[in-house]
UniProtKB/Swiss-Prot annotation:
Positions contributing to Mg(2+) binding: D518, D522
Broadest EC class assigned to this enzyme: translocase
Catalyzed reactions per annotation: K(+)(out) + ATP + H2O = K(+)(in) + ADP + phosphate + H(+)
Keywords: ATP-binding, Cell membrane, Ion transport, Magnesium, Membrane, Metal-binding, Nucleotide-binding, Phosphoprotein, Plasmid, Potassium, Potassium transport, Translocase, Transmembrane, Transmembrane helix, Transport
PANTHER family in alphabetical order: POTASSIUM-TRANSPORTING ATPASE ATP-BINDING SUBUNIT
Membrane topology qualifier: Multi-pass membrane protein
Main location: membrane
Gene3D superfamilies assigned to the protein according to its UniProt record, in alphabetical order: Calcium-transporting ATPase, cytoplasmic domain N (3.40.1110.10), Calcium-transporting ATPase, cytoplasmic transduction domain A (2.70.150.10), HAD superfamily/HAD-like (3.40.50.1000)
Organism from which the protein derives: Listeria innocua serovar 6a (strain ATCC BAA-680 / CLIP 11262)
EC number: 7.2.2.6
Protein name, per record: Potassium-transporting ATPase ATP-binding subunit 2
GO cellular component: plasma membrane
GO molecular function: ATP binding; ATP hydrolysis activity; magnesium ion binding; P-type potassium transmembrane transporter activity
Length: 686
């Protein structure tokens, strides 16, 4: 599967906008939303005040102006780097939003009023309006096709150049504003008011206008705020103790100590990680309608998968007509064609095509308008036709036809079950055909399992994710395909309400459930699931019920989205571990330097042997600032995710980001000290 091309990290336009955004976000009204970085900003303001009023907190500190200035500059850079990381993440989304907005500019629509056309601005259309869109024209807003069949170019939204066939009725009647009618014409009923269309929602989300913190972000922010408060209490307590013991502790040093000990690294990158997670989902042409949905993907442990389209290609085609009595084969084909002549599904069309190829004589279908066609429903699980002469023809699932025949007083042929079972054992789908009380035979529908799924399901199983296949097929067919595909379990003869029951049962056991769907009958289950991915080719009801929409309408993407969600959680956890581990090294850099002159016993903790107290504090501050931009690519790209047991993954990340988070600052601070110590000596701060 190809990812959609997005603006690169080093795109000049994005970087320019990000630099500007970094300064704009210094506004305290914005900074207060990130308590950790807000504390840093307060520290920077205090340091700036001390540059002009060095004796603000008492004492004679005229010789500290240069030191205070250096602390202020480093703290300002820390804030700018943190804001820059968030602005870069937002910039990628805004670049995508700009391209989406181009599809809405100066768009006109042919509004049908009282049977007449009227050209109006697309942004004036409201729910319920009916518009006509001819070949080459852009569909003005989201809607449902009420008349016409046409190819629709969705490349402006999905990036896929191949047109998609759209027609009224069924699950492929939904169209998206901004796409283009490539052939024929469509009459569309608008389903959204101005500002509420799918493109409008996409623009709001990728620009970050409607992004809310996810539950895990809130929990992590609470932890970071708690750690910040604890360190603030420690620092505030340290000041009177220093005065009591006769130790001179400049306020700028206390500010520096505070900034170094609070988790500024993860505090500065937290928003960028969340925004980048949503961006990674959009790179797979999936629109997440909330950050919570992406995050929930990382916790998924149960996946409800439709057989058709997800596990198999979904193009079940008629392969053979199997008559119960060989002398009645032509009757079987004849009745199968009549029952399918108005069935616009691929299966129905394939039955008509194969049947006409096999029949030696032409079939008269001119009087079909006088017939009453019976549409397939998930409840009856059969379809058919009542002919003008009163003949009732039905085709459908084995058990549904059996029930139907018994209800009208017919008999069940003794060899029917064997023929149905033989097809099911081959992984095919049997459709039984009857006319009046007599069953004439079975249609063999074949489907193919998508390559690579067996290995993928095995990988999911290895990390504890259970896969459940839902299908309307009979148990034998379902069991054969489930075994071949390698899913953990299956639900045969599945109705829409069965999916909801499975989801609720799993959720009652504290499981996090994901599923895909495209039809109106999938909407309740999509709404119930923790992660519901609707196909863009599906109905409006399905897209409104889901919390994600797949623009490519590829149900197998649920597997990729789950992996992205897990990568998001792992990235956030890894960088949090790294940030907190950093504090240990910074502690050993600053604390001994502050008290060594007065408390010689601190020499035991002075394992870094930094040049001076000023050099130690400034080196730690500089490292604290530059580590943020160094980690921006990792926050944006995400920690490399491997499908493995959580215990093994935790051990690996603790080693890399925990132990590594302690070692890197020791090396970094020492190297910075070696560079700046001579400069500080020249400035009189040696």
């Amino acid at each position: 599967m190809e990812k959609k091309a997005k603006p690169g990290f080093w795109d000049k336009k994005i970087l320019g906008t990000a630099v500007k955004g970094a300064f704009i976000k210094l506004n305290p009204v914005y900074m207060v939303k990130n308590p950790v970085m807000f504390v840093v900003e307060i520290g920077a303001i205090i340091s700036l005040a001390l540059c002009f009023f060095p004796n603000l907190f008492g004492g004679n500190n005229q010789d500290m102006i240069l030191y205070n200035s250096l602390v202020f500059i480093i703290l300002l850079l820390t804030l700018l780097f943190a804001n820059f990381s968030e602005s870069v993440a937002e910039g990628r989304g805004k670049a995508q939003a700009a391209s989406l907005k181009q599809t809405q500019q100066d768009m006109q629509a042919r509004l049908i009023l009282n049977g007449k056309e009227k050209v109006v601005n697309a942004n004036t259309l409201k729910k319920g309006d009916i518009v006509l869109v001819n070949m080459g024209e852009v569909i003005p807003s989201d809607g449902e096709i009420i008349e016409g069949v046409a190819s629709v170019d969705e490349s402006a939204i999905t990036g896929e150049s191949a047109p998609v066939l759209k027609e009224s009725g069924g699950d492929f009647a939904s169209v998206t504003g901004g796409t283009t009618v490539a052939s024929d014409y469509l009459k569309i009923q608008i389903t959204s008011n101005p500002g509420e269309s799918f493109i409008d929602k996409m623009i709001q989300l990728v620009e970050g206008a409607s992004r809310k913190k996810t539950p895990n972000e809130i929990a992590l922010s609470t932890l970071l705020v708690s750690l910040t408060i604890i360190f603030l209490i420690v620092i505030v307590s340290l000041y009177p103790m220093a005065i009591y013991t006769g130790i001179k502790l400049p306020v700028s040093t206390l500010v520096a100590l505070t900034v170094c000990l609070i988790p500024t690294t993860i505090g500065g990158l937290l928003s960028a990680i969340g925004i980048a997670g949503m961006d990674r989902v959009t790179r797979f042409n999936v629109i997440a309608l909330s950050g919570k949905a992406v995050e929930a993907c990382g916790d998924v442990d149960t996946m409800i998968l439709d057989k058709t389209g997800t596990i198999t290609y979904g193009n079940r085609m008629a392969s053979e007509f199997i008559a119960l009595d060989k002398g009645n084969k032509n009757y079987l084909i004849h009745y199968a064609i009549l029952a399918s002549i108005q069935d616009n599904t691929p299966e129905g069309k394939s039955i008509v095509t194969l049947g006409k190829d096999l029949l030696k004589e032409d079939l008269d279908t001119n009087d079909i308008r006088e017939n009453q066609f019976i549409e397939f429903t998930a409840q009856t699980r059969m379809s058919g036709v009542d002919l003008a002469d009163g003949t009732r023809i039905r085709k459908g699932a084995y058990d549904a036809i059996i029930k139907y025949i018994k209800n009208i007083g017919g008999e069940i042929p003794h060899d029917l079950e064997d023929k149905v079972n033989n097809i099911s054992k081959l992984g095919g789908t049997p459709l039984v055909v009857c006319a009046e009380e007599k069953i004439y035979g079975v249609i063999y529908l074949k489907d193919t399992i998508k390559p690579g799924l067996v290995e993928r399901f095995e990988r999911l199983r290895s990390i504890g994710i259970k896969t459940i296949m839902c299908t309307g097929d009979n148990p034998l067919t379902a069991a054969t395909i489930a075994h071949e595909a390698g899913v953990d379990s299956f639900i045969a003869e599945c109705k829409p309400e069965d999916k909801i029951k499975v989801i609720k049962d799993a959720q009652s056991k504290s499981k996090v459930v994901a599923m895909t769907g495209d039809g109106t009958n999938d909407a309740p289950a999509l709404a119930q699931a923790d992660v519901g991915i609707a196909m863009n080719s599906g109905t409006t009801a399905a897209k409104e019920a889901a919390n994600m929409v797949d623009l490519d309408s590829d149900p197998t993407k649920i597997l990729d989205v789950v992996e992205i969600g897990k990568q998001l959680l792992i990235t956030r956890g890894a960088l949090t571990t790294f940030s907190i581990a950093n504090d240990i090294a910074k502690y050993f850099a600053i604390i001994p330097a502050m008290f060594l002159a007065i408390i010689p016993q601190m020499q035991v903790l002075n394992i870094m042997h930094l040049s001076s107290s000023y050099s130690a504090i400034l080196s730690a501050l500089i490292f604290n600032a530059i580590i943020i931009p160094c980690l921006i690519p990792l926050a944006m790209k995400g920690v490399k995710y491997k499908l493995q047991r959580s215990e093994k993954m935790l051990a690996h990340n603790m080693l890399v980001y925990g132990v590594g988070g302690m070692i890197v600052p020791f090396i970094g601070i020492k190297l910075i000290d070696l560079v700046i110590a001579p400069l500080l000596t020249m400035m009189g701060l040696g």
